[in-house]
Amino acid sequence: MDIPFEEGVLSPSAADMRPEPPNSLDLNDTHPRRIKLTAPNINLSLDQSEGSILSDDNLDSPDEIDINVDELDTPDEADSFEYAGHEDPTANKDSGQESESIPEYTAEEEREDNRLWRTVVIGEQEQRIDMKVIEPYRRVISHGGYYGDGLNAIIVFAACFLPDSSRADYHYVMENLFLYVISTLELMVAEDYMIVYLNGATPRRRMPGLGWMKKCYQMIDRRLRKNLKSFIIVHPSWFIRTILAATRPFISSKFSSKIKYVNSLSELSGLIPMDCIHIPESIIKLDEELREASEAAKTSCLYNDPEMSSMEKDIDLKLKEKP
């Protein structure tokens, strides 16, 4: 639609000849004139010829570019919109992978974690025990009932359940097992108590070292040291006797006087009640073998005794042949 102009249509060259705009409004003019300008013809070609948008003639110099940021119209929040067109499908995929990389910590997993770790206080210091790594060795310490009057506990320590020293994580296992033994001992003992150390059926590679036993003794609470009435070692070997002899310099004479050696389970039953004491099968088998070997040795000594008459030997043989 053609729009008539009162002064005529201005050409692009005439726009440069416009008079300067007034600095004040003429409020006395009752019929102000409105001038409308038409856009110049623009060549949309990509070459830099005259009239093209890439031409240097259309580029404003830095002095001519004067933009007042405060006077620019910005869209309101209501006028804004989100572009939901061609989205990158990999963006959603990456965000989904990031959300899946951190799994939710469920209540069941929290309970399971509490079962795998136990927090104890030993020597006024809080310690954490890796219960998973010592699970196969928890039978090393057990409650064997009571003796005498009151709550005099019998604590059974079975060395045959100790870990093998050939394990790659042997020191880590023994460290956690040490904390478990000490904390369990404090829970089991209320008054006086005794320790029954089952040394039999334990290969050399499973025997605890001198440093480990020394640390156990030093970490035991003073109350537990005082209330310990007896330390019975069943089936003692020359190795355990040597270990205890080496520990005498740093243990008290009172503790040394509490150590007793017992060579058989029958001898142990004459000292304490055996009803609640769990004896491993390997130790029971060893005890039978030692008893048979002892009887055979006695018989051999009797037959080799020159003072024993032939009549006494015949009587002894007849007694053994009777059912």
Curated annotation (Swiss-Prot):
Domain CRAL-TRIO as annotated: residue spans: 130-291
Main location: cytoplasm
Gene3D superfamilies membership: CRAL-TRIO lipid binding domain
Localization (cell): Cytoplasm
Top-rank lineage group of the source organism: Eukaryota
GO cellular component: cytoplasm
Classification via InterPro entries: Bcl2-/adenovirus-E1B, CRAL-TRIO_dom, CRAL-TRIO_dom_sf
Keywords attached to this entry: Apoptosis, Cytoplasm
Acidic residues bias: start-end ranges: 57-67
Biological processes annotated in GO: apoptotic process
Annotated region (Disordered), positions in chain: 1-67, 79-110
Pfam families the UniProt entry points to: BNIP2, CRAL_TRIO_2
Keyword Cytoplasm: yes
Compositional bias annotation for Polar residues: 40-52
Role description: May play an important role in regulating differentiation, survival and aggressiveness of the tumor cells.
PANTHER family referenced in this protein's UniProt entry, alphabetically: BNIP - RELATED (PTHR12112), PROTEIN PRUNE HOMOLOG 2 (PTHR12112:SF11)
Protein name: Protein prune homolog 2
Gene source species: Pongo abelii
Gene: PRUNE2
